[in-house]
Amino acid sequence: MNSFKKFLNKKRVQNHFKKSGEGVRLSSGESSSQPSAHAGAAQGGQIDRVAAADIAAQAAFKRMQKNEPQQNAGKRRIQMIAKRELEEERRQVEDLNISGTSSLQQPDREQHLEHSSAISRVLYTSELLGEHHIRSKADLLEDIKNFLSDQISEADDENDKVIAAVLMLYSLNKKHPKETAIETICKYCQNILEHPGEDKYKSIRLGNKAFQERVASVVGGRAFLEAVGFTEKSEGEDKFLVFTKPSDVHLVEALEALKDGQAVPIKVARNLEIFKLKEGQKPKAPKLADDFYNLSTAELKAEQRNKEMQVERMLTLRTKEMRQKDEQMTNYRYKYTLIRVRLPGNLLMQGVFGCHEPFSAVRVFVASTLSDALSTSEFTLRDAASQLVEDESASLAQLSLAPAALLHVVFAENLSDYGQIVADEHIEIIQELEASD
Protein backbone atom coordinates (compact mmCIF):
# COMPACT_ATOMS: atom_id res chain seq x y z
CA MET A 1 0.00 0.00 0.00
CA ASN A 2 2.99 2.31 0.52
CA SER A 3 3.56 2.42 -3.24
CA PHE A 4 0.12 3.98 -3.72
CA LYS A 5 0.72 6.58 -1.02
CA LYS A 6 4.10 7.46 -2.50
CA PHE A 7 2.55 7.82 -5.96
CA LEU A 8 -0.28 10.05 -4.70
CA ASN A 9 2.10 12.19 -2.64
CA LYS A 10 4.53 12.58 -5.54
CA LYS A 11 1.81 13.61 -7.98
CA ARG A 12 0.25 15.98 -5.43
CA VAL A 13 3.60 17.73 -4.95
CA GLN A 14 4.13 17.93 -8.72
CA ASN A 15 0.67 19.43 -9.19
CA HIS A 16 1.35 21.95 -6.44
CA PHE A 17 4.54 23.22 -8.05
CA LYS A 18 2.97 23.31 -11.51
CA LYS A 19 0.25 25.62 -10.20
CA SER A 20 2.61 27.73 -8.10
CA GLY A 21 4.09 29.41 -11.17
CA GLU A 22 7.45 31.13 -11.06
CA GLY A 23 9.34 31.44 -7.81
CA VAL A 24 9.20 34.58 -5.68
CA ARG A 25 12.13 36.06 -3.77
CA LEU A 26 11.64 36.05 -0.02
CA SER A 27 12.65 39.73 0.08
CA SER A 28 10.01 40.77 -2.46
CA GLY A 29 7.17 40.73 0.06
CA GLU A 30 4.85 38.97 -2.36
CA SER A 31 2.68 36.10 -1.22
CA SER A 32 -0.08 34.03 -2.71
CA SER A 33 -3.57 34.08 -1.30
CA GLN A 34 -5.14 30.97 0.11
CA PRO A 35 -8.11 29.43 -1.70
CA SER A 36 -11.55 29.37 -0.15
CA ALA A 37 -12.41 25.80 -1.00
CA HIS A 38 -12.02 23.17 1.69
CA ALA A 39 -12.23 19.44 1.34
CA GLY A 40 -13.92 16.94 3.63
CA ALA A 41 -12.72 13.65 4.98
CA ALA A 42 -13.17 10.43 3.04
CA GLN A 43 -16.47 8.79 3.77
CA GLY A 44 -17.92 5.43 4.48
CA GLY A 45 -15.63 3.67 6.99
CA GLN A 46 -17.91 3.97 10.00
CA ILE A 47 -21.00 2.29 8.54
CA ASP A 48 -19.37 -1.13 8.23
CA ARG A 49 -17.89 -0.97 11.71
CA VAL A 50 -21.20 0.05 13.31
CA ALA A 51 -23.17 -2.57 11.41
CA ALA A 52 -20.64 -5.31 12.22
CA ALA A 53 -20.63 -4.42 15.91
CA ASP A 54 -24.42 -4.38 15.96
CA ILE A 55 -24.69 -7.80 14.32
CA ALA A 56 -22.15 -9.21 16.77
CA ALA A 57 -24.16 -7.83 19.68
CA GLN A 58 -27.33 -9.42 18.34
CA ALA A 59 -25.60 -12.78 17.93
CA ALA A 60 -24.32 -12.65 21.51
CA PHE A 61 -27.77 -11.79 22.81
CA LYS A 62 -29.34 -14.70 20.91
CA ARG A 63 -26.86 -17.09 22.53
CA MET A 64 -27.94 -15.79 25.92
CA GLN A 65 -31.58 -16.48 25.05
CA LYS A 66 -31.10 -20.12 24.02
CA ASN A 67 -32.84 -21.52 27.09
CA GLU A 68 -35.73 -19.04 27.18
CA PRO A 69 -39.27 -20.36 26.49
CA GLN A 70 -40.65 -20.25 22.97
CA GLN A 71 -42.38 -17.11 21.74
CA ASN A 72 -46.05 -16.80 22.54
CA ALA A 73 -48.77 -16.60 19.87
CA GLY A 74 -49.01 -12.79 20.02
CA LYS A 75 -45.33 -12.37 19.36
CA ARG A 76 -45.44 -14.82 16.45
CA ARG A 77 -48.36 -12.90 14.95
CA ILE A 78 -46.37 -9.65 15.12
CA GLN A 79 -43.50 -11.38 13.33
CA MET A 80 -45.81 -12.66 10.59
CA ILE A 81 -47.24 -9.17 9.98
CA ALA A 82 -43.79 -7.61 9.94
CA LYS A 83 -42.46 -10.25 7.54
CA ARG A 84 -45.43 -9.74 5.22
CA GLU A 85 -44.77 -6.00 5.14
CA LEU A 86 -41.08 -6.61 4.47
CA GLU A 87 -41.93 -8.96 1.60
CA GLU A 88 -44.14 -6.26 0.08
CA GLU A 89 -41.31 -3.71 0.36
CA ARG A 90 -38.87 -6.21 -1.14
CA ARG A 91 -41.15 -6.68 -4.14
CA GLN A 92 -41.29 -2.91 -4.57
CA VAL A 93 -37.48 -2.76 -4.57
CA GLU A 94 -37.36 -5.55 -7.18
CA ASP A 95 -39.87 -3.67 -9.33
CA LEU A 96 -37.62 -0.62 -9.12
CA ASN A 97 -34.67 -2.72 -10.23
CA ILE A 98 -36.59 -3.97 -13.28
CA SER A 99 -38.37 -0.86 -14.47
CA GLY A 100 -37.19 2.35 -12.98
CA THR A 101 -33.76 2.48 -11.41
CA SER A 102 -31.85 3.79 -14.39
CA SER A 103 -32.42 7.35 -13.27
CA LEU A 104 -31.00 6.53 -9.83
CA GLN A 105 -27.87 5.01 -11.34
CA GLN A 106 -26.85 7.97 -13.49
CA PRO A 107 -23.21 8.63 -12.58
CA ASP A 108 -23.49 12.33 -13.43
CA ARG A 109 -26.73 13.23 -11.69
CA GLU A 110 -24.88 16.07 -9.91
CA GLN A 111 -25.05 17.94 -13.22
CA HIS A 112 -28.86 18.09 -13.18
CA LEU A 113 -29.56 19.56 -9.77
CA GLU A 114 -32.37 22.09 -9.39
CA HIS A 115 -32.46 23.88 -6.06
CA SER A 116 -32.16 27.27 -4.40
CA SER A 117 -29.01 29.36 -4.24
CA ALA A 118 -28.42 28.06 -0.69
CA ILE A 119 -26.63 25.09 -2.26
CA SER A 120 -25.04 25.50 -5.65
CA ARG A 121 -24.30 21.75 -5.97
CA VAL A 122 -22.37 18.93 -4.36
CA LEU A 123 -18.76 19.04 -5.54
CA TYR A 124 -15.75 16.83 -4.96
CA THR A 125 -11.99 16.91 -4.82
CA SER A 126 -9.30 14.23 -4.72
CA GLU A 127 -5.89 13.60 -3.20
CA LEU A 128 -4.47 12.91 -6.66
CA LEU A 129 -5.39 16.20 -8.35
CA GLY A 130 -5.27 18.37 -5.23
CA GLU A 131 -7.85 20.07 -3.04
CA HIS A 132 -8.10 23.04 -5.39
CA HIS A 133 -9.29 20.87 -8.29
CA ILE A 134 -13.02 20.89 -7.52
CA ARG A 135 -15.57 19.32 -9.86
CA SER A 136 -18.82 17.37 -9.96
CA LYS A 137 -18.21 13.67 -9.34
CA ALA A 138 -18.61 12.71 -13.02
CA ASP A 139 -16.24 15.47 -14.16
CA LEU A 140 -13.72 14.67 -11.43
CA LEU A 141 -13.65 10.98 -12.37
CA GLU A 142 -13.13 11.95 -16.01
CA ASP A 143 -10.24 14.24 -15.01
CA ILE A 144 -8.72 11.45 -12.91
CA LYS A 145 -9.00 9.09 -15.88
CA ASN A 146 -7.27 11.57 -18.20
CA PHE A 147 -4.53 12.31 -15.66
CA LEU A 148 -3.77 8.63 -15.05
CA SER A 149 -3.83 7.91 -18.79
CA ASP A 150 -1.21 10.64 -19.28
CA GLN A 151 0.91 9.11 -16.52
CA ILE A 152 0.81 5.71 -18.20
CA SER A 153 1.83 7.11 -21.59
CA GLU A 154 4.42 9.65 -20.38
CA ALA A 155 5.95 8.33 -17.14
CA ASP A 156 9.59 7.23 -17.29
CA ASP A 157 9.25 5.07 -14.19
CA GLU A 158 7.76 1.67 -15.10
CA ASN A 159 6.43 1.27 -11.56
CA ASP A 160 4.52 4.56 -11.89
CA LYS A 161 2.80 3.19 -14.99
CA VAL A 162 1.71 0.07 -13.09
CA ILE A 163 0.43 2.07 -10.11
CA ALA A 164 -1.47 4.46 -12.42
CA ALA A 165 -3.15 1.52 -14.19
CA VAL A 166 -4.12 -0.06 -10.85
CA LEU A 167 -5.61 3.24 -9.66
CA MET A 168 -7.65 3.39 -12.87
CA LEU A 169 -8.96 -0.13 -12.31
CA TYR A 170 -10.00 0.54 -8.72
CA SER A 171 -11.30 4.10 -9.20
CA LEU A 172 -13.20 4.00 -12.48
CA ASN A 173 -15.04 0.66 -12.52
CA LYS A 174 -17.90 -0.97 -10.67
CA LYS A 175 -17.12 -3.74 -8.22
CA HIS A 176 -18.03 -6.86 -10.23
CA PRO A 177 -16.35 -5.92 -13.56
CA LYS A 178 -13.29 -4.74 -11.62
CA GLU A 179 -12.96 -7.98 -9.66
CA THR A 180 -13.46 -10.07 -12.81
CA ALA A 181 -10.77 -8.10 -14.66
CA ILE A 182 -8.31 -8.38 -11.77
CA GLU A 183 -8.88 -12.13 -11.51
CA THR A 184 -8.30 -12.59 -15.25
CA ILE A 185 -5.21 -10.36 -15.39
CA CYS A 186 -3.72 -12.18 -12.39
CA LYS A 187 -4.23 -15.47 -14.23
CA TYR A 188 -2.43 -14.14 -17.31
CA CYS A 189 0.57 -13.02 -15.25
CA GLN A 190 0.66 -16.10 -13.02
CA ASN A 191 0.74 -18.36 -16.09
CA ILE A 192 3.83 -16.52 -17.33
CA LEU A 193 5.51 -16.87 -13.93
CA GLU A 194 4.61 -20.55 -13.59
CA HIS A 195 5.46 -21.49 -17.20
CA PRO A 196 8.36 -19.20 -18.17
CA GLY A 197 9.41 -21.30 -21.16
CA GLU A 198 6.01 -21.61 -22.85
CA ASP A 199 5.24 -18.87 -25.38
CA LYS A 200 1.52 -19.69 -25.53
CA TYR A 201 1.05 -18.06 -22.12
CA LYS A 202 2.75 -14.87 -23.32
CA SER A 203 0.21 -14.11 -26.05
CA ILE A 204 -3.40 -12.86 -25.74
CA ARG A 205 -5.59 -12.65 -28.83
CA LEU A 206 -7.38 -9.29 -28.76
CA GLY A 207 -10.44 -10.73 -30.49
CA ASN A 208 -10.87 -13.37 -27.80
CA LYS A 209 -14.38 -13.10 -26.33
CA ALA A 210 -13.24 -13.68 -22.75
CA PHE A 211 -10.58 -10.97 -23.07
CA GLN A 212 -13.05 -8.51 -24.59
CA GLU A 213 -15.68 -9.08 -21.89
CA ARG A 214 -13.42 -9.46 -18.88
CA VAL A 215 -10.48 -7.12 -19.50
CA ALA A 216 -10.84 -4.86 -22.55
CA SER A 217 -14.23 -3.54 -21.38
CA VAL A 218 -12.79 -2.43 -18.02
CA VAL A 219 -11.06 0.94 -17.68
CA GLY A 220 -7.38 0.32 -16.98
CA GLY A 221 -7.41 -3.40 -17.79
CA ARG A 222 -5.42 -3.27 -21.01
CA ALA A 223 -3.34 -0.38 -19.64
CA PHE A 224 -2.10 -2.62 -16.82
CA LEU A 225 -1.07 -5.37 -19.23
CA GLU A 226 0.82 -2.87 -21.38
CA ALA A 227 2.46 -1.38 -18.28
CA VAL A 228 3.89 -4.77 -17.25
CA GLY A 229 5.30 -5.51 -20.71
CA PHE A 230 2.58 -6.60 -23.15
CA THR A 231 2.84 -5.07 -26.64
CA GLU A 232 0.31 -5.20 -29.47
CA LYS A 233 1.42 -7.24 -32.50
CA SER A 234 -0.29 -8.51 -35.65
CA GLU A 235 -0.24 -11.97 -37.22
CA GLY A 236 -2.19 -11.87 -40.46
CA GLU A 237 -5.62 -10.46 -39.69
CA ASP A 238 -5.41 -11.24 -35.98
CA LYS A 239 -4.00 -8.89 -33.37
CA PHE A 240 -2.37 -10.01 -30.14
CA LEU A 241 -0.96 -8.62 -26.92
CA VAL A 242 2.43 -10.28 -26.54
CA PHE A 243 4.62 -10.24 -23.43
CA THR A 244 7.96 -8.99 -24.75
CA LYS A 245 9.99 -8.33 -21.59
CA PRO A 246 13.18 -10.42 -21.31
CA SER A 247 12.53 -10.94 -17.59
CA ASP A 248 9.34 -11.65 -15.69
CA VAL A 249 10.66 -10.86 -12.18
CA HIS A 250 8.83 -7.52 -12.08
CA LEU A 251 5.48 -9.33 -12.47
CA VAL A 252 5.58 -10.46 -8.84
CA GLU A 253 5.60 -6.89 -7.53
CA ALA A 254 3.05 -5.80 -10.15
CA LEU A 255 0.67 -8.57 -9.08
CA GLU A 256 1.00 -7.54 -5.43
CA ALA A 257 0.11 -3.98 -6.38
CA LEU A 258 -2.88 -5.23 -8.38
CA LYS A 259 -4.22 -7.43 -5.58
CA ASP A 260 -3.67 -4.78 -2.88
CA GLY A 261 -4.88 -1.88 -5.02
CA GLN A 262 -6.97 1.05 -3.89
CA ALA A 263 -9.08 3.76 -5.45
CA VAL A 264 -8.04 7.40 -5.61
CA PRO A 265 -9.49 8.94 -2.41
CA ILE A 266 -12.35 11.29 -3.33
CA LYS A 267 -13.72 13.77 -0.79
CA VAL A 268 -16.69 16.07 -0.73
CA ALA A 269 -15.58 19.69 -1.20
CA ARG A 270 -16.65 22.17 1.44
CA ASN A 271 -17.91 24.63 -1.17
CA LEU A 272 -17.58 27.48 1.33
CA GLU A 273 -20.13 30.29 1.13
CA ILE A 274 -20.43 33.29 3.46
CA PHE A 275 -23.56 35.41 3.72
CA LYS A 276 -24.25 38.80 5.25
CA LEU A 277 -27.55 38.88 7.09
CA LYS A 278 -29.70 41.97 7.23
CA GLU A 279 -30.57 43.36 10.62
CA GLY A 280 -33.14 41.04 12.19
CA GLN A 281 -32.97 38.51 9.33
CA LYS A 282 -33.12 34.88 10.40
CA PRO A 283 -31.76 32.17 8.10
CA LYS A 284 -34.31 29.55 7.10
CA ALA A 285 -33.73 25.86 6.58
CA PRO A 286 -32.23 25.58 3.09
CA LYS A 287 -33.72 23.60 0.24
CA LEU A 288 -31.41 20.65 -0.31
CA ALA A 289 -30.08 19.11 -3.50
CA ASP A 290 -31.34 15.81 -4.89
CA ASP A 291 -28.01 14.20 -3.97
CA PHE A 292 -28.84 14.59 -0.28
CA TYR A 293 -31.78 12.19 -0.65
CA ASN A 294 -31.47 10.10 -3.84
CA LEU A 295 -30.57 6.50 -3.17
CA SER A 296 -29.01 4.08 -5.62
CA THR A 297 -30.30 0.53 -6.08
CA ALA A 298 -27.59 -0.76 -3.75
CA GLU A 299 -28.60 1.80 -1.12
CA LEU A 300 -32.26 0.79 -1.47
CA LYS A 301 -31.28 -2.81 -0.80
CA ALA A 302 -29.23 -1.68 2.19
CA GLU A 303 -32.29 0.20 3.47
CA GLN A 304 -34.30 -3.01 3.06
CA ARG A 305 -31.76 -4.91 5.16
CA ASN A 306 -31.92 -2.18 7.80
CA LYS A 307 -35.70 -2.58 8.00
CA GLU A 308 -35.30 -6.33 8.51
CA MET A 309 -32.85 -5.66 11.31
CA GLN A 310 -35.30 -3.16 12.85
CA VAL A 311 -38.01 -5.84 13.00
CA GLU A 312 -35.56 -8.16 14.73
CA ARG A 313 -34.68 -5.43 17.23
CA MET A 314 -38.34 -4.71 18.02
CA LEU A 315 -38.82 -8.33 19.03
CA THR A 316 -35.76 -8.57 21.30
CA LEU A 317 -34.71 -6.90 24.52
CA ARG A 318 -32.27 -4.08 23.78
CA THR A 319 -29.66 -2.52 26.05
CA LYS A 320 -29.26 1.26 26.18
CA GLU A 321 -26.10 1.08 24.06
CA MET A 322 -27.89 -1.04 21.45
CA ARG A 323 -30.79 1.44 21.28
CA GLN A 324 -28.34 4.32 20.76
CA LYS A 325 -26.77 2.47 17.84
CA ASP A 326 -30.24 1.84 16.42
CA GLU A 327 -30.90 5.59 16.45
CA GLN A 328 -27.58 6.28 14.76
CA MET A 329 -28.31 3.82 11.96
CA THR A 330 -31.48 5.70 11.00
CA ASN A 331 -29.38 8.63 9.75
CA TYR A 332 -27.22 6.63 7.37
CA ARG A 333 -29.57 7.14 4.42
CA TYR A 334 -28.18 10.69 4.05
CA LYS A 335 -24.93 11.08 2.16
CA TYR A 336 -24.16 14.70 2.98
CA THR A 337 -25.23 17.41 5.33
CA LEU A 338 -25.22 21.18 4.92
CA ILE A 339 -23.85 22.90 8.01
CA ARG A 340 -24.52 26.59 8.52
CA VAL A 341 -22.64 28.46 11.23
CA ARG A 342 -23.75 31.83 12.59
CA LEU A 343 -20.81 34.19 13.24
CA PRO A 344 -20.67 37.54 15.04
CA GLY A 345 -21.26 40.57 12.86
CA ASN A 346 -24.41 39.13 11.21
CA LEU A 347 -22.34 36.70 9.17
CA LEU A 348 -23.42 33.20 8.20
CA MET A 349 -21.01 30.67 6.73
CA GLN A 350 -21.93 27.30 5.28
CA GLY A 351 -20.16 24.20 4.03
CA VAL A 352 -20.99 20.69 2.85
CA PHE A 353 -19.87 17.69 4.91
CA GLY A 354 -20.11 13.94 4.64
CA CYS A 355 -22.53 12.63 7.26
CA HIS A 356 -19.86 10.32 8.66
CA GLU A 357 -17.30 13.04 9.25
CA PRO A 358 -16.64 13.85 12.92
CA PHE A 359 -18.00 17.02 14.48
CA SER A 360 -14.40 18.15 14.93
CA ALA A 361 -14.27 18.66 11.13
CA VAL A 362 -16.79 21.49 11.55
CA ARG A 363 -14.56 23.14 14.16
CA VAL A 364 -11.55 22.92 11.82
CA PHE A 365 -13.66 24.35 8.99
CA VAL A 366 -14.78 27.33 11.09
CA ALA A 367 -11.28 28.01 12.43
CA SER A 368 -9.82 27.98 8.92
CA THR A 369 -12.07 30.85 7.81
CA LEU A 370 -11.39 33.19 10.74
CA SER A 371 -9.13 36.22 10.47
CA ASP A 372 -5.54 36.06 11.69
CA ALA A 373 -6.52 38.02 14.79
CA LEU A 374 -9.10 35.38 15.74
CA SER A 375 -7.27 32.28 14.53
CA THR A 376 -6.04 31.41 18.04
CA SER A 377 -9.19 32.51 19.89
CA GLU A 378 -11.16 29.92 21.82
CA PHE A 379 -14.74 29.35 20.72
CA THR A 380 -17.55 26.86 21.15
CA LEU A 381 -20.15 25.63 18.69
CA ARG A 382 -23.71 25.44 19.95
CA ASP A 383 -26.94 24.24 18.39
CA ALA A 384 -30.23 26.16 18.26
CA ALA A 385 -30.94 25.15 21.87
CA SER A 386 -27.49 26.43 22.99
CA GLN A 387 -26.37 22.87 23.67
CA LEU A 388 -22.68 21.97 23.41
CA VAL A 389 -21.36 18.84 21.73
CA GLU A 390 -19.36 16.95 24.34
CA ASP A 391 -17.89 14.28 22.06
CA GLU A 392 -16.49 15.98 18.97
CA SER A 393 -15.34 12.64 17.59
CA ALA A 394 -18.98 11.64 17.05
CA SER A 395 -20.16 11.79 13.45
CA LEU A 396 -22.58 14.42 12.21
CA ALA A 397 -25.12 11.67 11.54
CA GLN A 398 -24.82 10.37 15.10
CA LEU A 399 -25.44 13.89 16.38
CA SER A 400 -28.58 14.22 14.21
CA LEU A 401 -27.00 17.06 12.23
CA ALA A 402 -28.17 15.62 8.90
CA PRO A 403 -29.30 16.53 6.31
CA ALA A 404 -28.87 20.18 7.45
CA ALA A 405 -28.15 22.05 10.65
CA LEU A 406 -27.59 25.56 12.00
CA LEU A 407 -24.91 26.15 14.63
CA HIS A 408 -23.74 29.26 16.49
CA VAL A 409 -20.17 30.32 17.29
CA VAL A 410 -19.63 31.66 20.79
CA PHE A 411 -16.21 33.17 21.49
CA ALA A 412 -14.68 32.97 24.95
CA GLU A 413 -13.59 36.62 24.88
CA ASN A 414 -14.93 39.99 23.80
CA LEU A 415 -14.42 40.61 20.07
CA SER A 416 -14.61 44.40 20.15
CA ASP A 417 -10.83 44.68 19.84
CA TYR A 418 -10.45 42.20 17.00
CA GLY A 419 -12.25 43.96 14.15
CA GLN A 420 -12.62 41.74 11.08
CA ILE A 421 -14.15 38.29 11.66
CA VAL A 422 -13.24 36.31 8.53
CA ALA A 423 -9.87 36.07 6.79
CA ASP A 424 -8.98 38.52 4.02
CA GLU A 425 -9.14 35.90 1.28
CA HIS A 426 -12.80 35.21 2.07
CA ILE A 427 -14.03 38.81 2.13
CA GLU A 428 -14.74 38.91 -1.59
CA ILE A 429 -17.11 35.90 -1.48
CA ILE A 430 -19.45 37.44 1.11
CA GLN A 431 -22.92 37.90 -0.37
CA GLU A 432 -26.37 38.81 0.87
CA LEU A 433 -28.60 35.95 1.97
CA GLU A 434 -31.72 35.85 -0.14
CA ALA A 435 -35.03 35.75 1.68
CA SER A 436 -35.87 32.34 0.16
CA ASP A 437 -32.65 30.86 1.53
Swiss-Prot record:
| GO CC aspect terms | cytoplasm
Induction or repression: Up-regulated in response to starvation (at protein level).
The protein's matches in SMART domains, at most eight in alphabetical order, are given as: PUG
Q: Which Pfam families match?
A: PUB (PF09409)
Q: Which Gene3D superfamilies match?
A: 1.20.58.2190, Phosphatidylinositol 3-kinase Catalytic Subunit, Chain A, domain 1
User: UBX domain location, by residue?
Assistant: 332-409
According to the lineage, what is the superkingdom? Eukaryota
Q: Which InterPro entries match?
A: PUB-like_dom_sf, PUB_domain, Ubiquitin-like_domsf, UBX_dom, UBXN6_PUB
Q: In which tissues is it expressed?
A: Expressed in the pharynx and some head neurons.
Q: Where is this region: Disordered?
A: 1-45, 89-109
How does inactivating the gene affect the organism? Reduced lifespan. Prolonged expression of the lysosomal protein glo-1 12 hours after starvation.
* Compositionally biased spans, kind Basic residues: 7-18
Give the PUB domain ranges.
179-251
Q: How does it assemble?
A: Interacts with cdc-48.1 (via N-terminus) and cdc-48.2 (via N-terminus).
- Function according to Swiss-Prot or TrEMBL: Probably acts as an adapter for ATPase cdc-48.1 and/or cdc-48.2, conferring substrate specificity. Involved in the lysosomal clearance of cellular material in diet restricted conditions.
This protein is called what? UBX domain-containing protein 6
Recite the lineage of the species: Eukaryota, Metazoa, Ecdysozoa, Nematoda, Chromadorea
